[in-house]
Curated annotation (Swiss-Prot):
Confers resistance to the antitumor agent cisplatin. Binds preferentially to sites of DNA modified by cisplatin in vitro. Binds to double-stranded DNA in a cooperative manner resulting in the formation of filament-like structures. Binds to single-stranded DNA with no cooperativity. Binds to RNA. It comes from the Eukaryota. Homodimer. One of its GO terms (biological process) is double-strand break repair. Residues 15-95 form the RRM domain. The keyword Nucleus applies. This is RAD52 motif-containing protein 1. GO terms for cellular component: cytoplasm; nucleolus. InterPro entries: Nucleotide-bd_a/b_plait_sf, Rad52_fam, Rad52_Rad59_Rad22_sf, RBD_domain_sf, RDM1, RDM1_RRM, RRM_dom. One of its GO terms (molecular function) is RNA binding. Keywords: Cytoplasm, DNA-binding, Nucleus, RNA-binding.
Length: 277
């Protein structure tokens, strides 16, 4: 049976494994990652100490993107010692009936990781259509020396040449600068906000892609019409002409956090060349 994967944080119980009976050791998360990543791409590995009533030891929550990969890992690892002296217990997580978890879109780094795994490094490409400074349109009366807001708007196109699929996404990055008169602080904030806008736009573009993983391991791609936005019907010229945020028909979506602190001034803008305005 085929499995459909979205560029979203895995939230299904079938994609999540509970591992207990772990012996506390240095590098436990790394050991778990090394073992379970052999069965498929992992979203996360989290280790926690047992509750006091459960006695000493640890347990782990491991999230796969694919439920099929999680199932194979559970059957292969349950009852095995793996990297410790005592056997581990591994089961697929279950949730209480009626429990609903918010499903977040993957951030741009995770989107690229998922695309590289299933499509290959050369199986997709992206380009920036426009990256515009839209700061100040809502802050015309800002006082000199006071906190200033930096905003950048970005539109990105993702192309999957082997599947004939092309999608676009739009993202808005913004941050406040405590001292708008400090050129170094303002320049640093500007580059980080640019990267944030590019990352959000890339994630938005990937939301329109569905990966269909067949039993044979081959991957097909479908366009996710449910994720379409008003901006998808605009021409590139119209996208490049979007300047005022108040005129931007952005559809908000719940996005896994793009962490500004992870973006340093020394980094180049992610992967793509920024068009000159």
């Amino acid at each position: 049976m085929a499995e459909v994967l979205e560029f979203r944080v895995p939230a299904g119980s079938a994609q999540t494994l509970l591992v207990w009976g772990l012996e506390p050791t240095v590098g436990l998360e790394h050991s778990l990652f090394s073992v379970f990543s052999k069965f498929g791409l992992l979203y996360s590995v989290r280790v926690h100490s047992n509750a006091a009533v459960a006695g000493p030891g640890c347990y782990a929550i491991i999230k796969f993107y694919s439920a099929a990969d999680a199932s194979r890992a559970q059957h292969a690892c349950n009852g095995q010692r793996l990297f410790q002296n005592s056997p581990l217990k591994v089961c697929v997580c279950t949730k209480q009936k009626g429990f609903q978890q918010q499903v977040l879109a993957l951030n741009s780094n995770k989107c690229q990781e998922l695309a590289n795994h299933y499509l290959g490094f050369n199986g997709w490409s992206s380009r920036i259509i426009t990256l515009q400074n839209v700061s100040g349109f809502d802050d015309e009366n800002e006082e000199v020396g006071k906190k200033r807001s930096v905003r950048y708007l970005c539109a990105v196109e993702v192309t999957l040449p082997n599947h004939g699929v092309r999608t676009r996404g739009v993202g808005l990055g913004e941050a406040d600068v405590e001292s708008g008169e400090d050129p170094l602080e303002f320049g640093t904030a500007t580059r980080r906000v640019q990267k944030l806008a590019v990352g959000k736009a890339l994630s938005s573009a990937f939301q329109k892609i569905l990966l269909v993983v067949l039993e044979s391991g081959k991957v097909a791609v479908e366009y996710n019409h449910a994720a379409e936005e008003p901006t998808d019907s605009l021409t590139e010229e119209e996208l490049e002409g979007l300047v005022q945020v108040s005129e931007l028909p952005l559809e908000p979506f719940d996005l896994e956090e793009e962490v500004l602190s992870d973006l340093t001034l020394d980094d180049e803008l992610p992967v793509w060349e920024v068009p000159s305005n």
